[in-house]
């Protein structure tokens, strides 16, 4: 059989992780992107830089500090222990939290660009019709920014699927609990099981190509990033 039970388990876990992370990224990233697109605060540059840090930081550096923060002596770790949730490292929940931090700029950037492209005119028209802020956002902004949401969701999902360094630092290598496809490929290569590694790696290459093809061949991609 080309794929073992451990391979299939890693695929299932990766898809679950990417799906849940993408939903959380959209929930967290949307208000951040909206604030960055609309604010004139002097903090805009600093907040934007913090959000974009995962783009330039080595995954091991980000993973290390997340591990310390979520550990038993870190602020997040102390909070989760106080709430009776234990610590997050080496758990699926820890992977989700780390993935949200790591993939956040891939969601915020296209959303911010989409919000900025809307301009002031549609918002002014909605205001003259006495639409409230929430009504304006959900009935005017969201439909106009739909290409940006699609782009953000695709990029967030794809980036989460391909994570390795942060996942390994936070989740370790626990079968059916924290072992993703990327970690499973690493295990196969380390054990010189190249045939098994080829099946998974080839699938990742095909998946990445299809994602990029869908983005670059769609006008929605250009609208979301312009």
Curated annotation (Swiss-Prot):
PROSITE patterns: ABC_TM1 (PS50928). Keywords: Cell inner membrane, Cell membrane, Membrane, Molybdenum, Transmembrane, Transmembrane helix, Transport. The gene is modB. Belongs to the binding-protein-dependent transport system permease family. CysTW subfamily. GO terms for cellular component: plasma membrane. Residues 11-217 form the ABC transmembrane type-1 domain. InterPro entries: MetI-like (IPR000515), MetI-like_sf (IPR035906), ModB_ABC (IPR011867). Its main location: membrane. It is found in: Cell inner membrane. It is a multi-pass membrane protein. The lineage of its organism: Bacteria, Pseudomonadati, Pseudomonadota, Gammaproteobacteria, Pseudomonadales. Pfam families: BPD_transp_1 (PF00528). GO terms for molecular function: molybdate ion transmembrane transporter activity. The chain crosses the membrane at residues 17-37, 47-67, 88-108, 150-170, 197-217. This is Molybdenum transport system permease protein ModB. Part of the binding-protein-dependent transport system for molybdenum; probably responsible for the translocation of the substrate across the membrane.
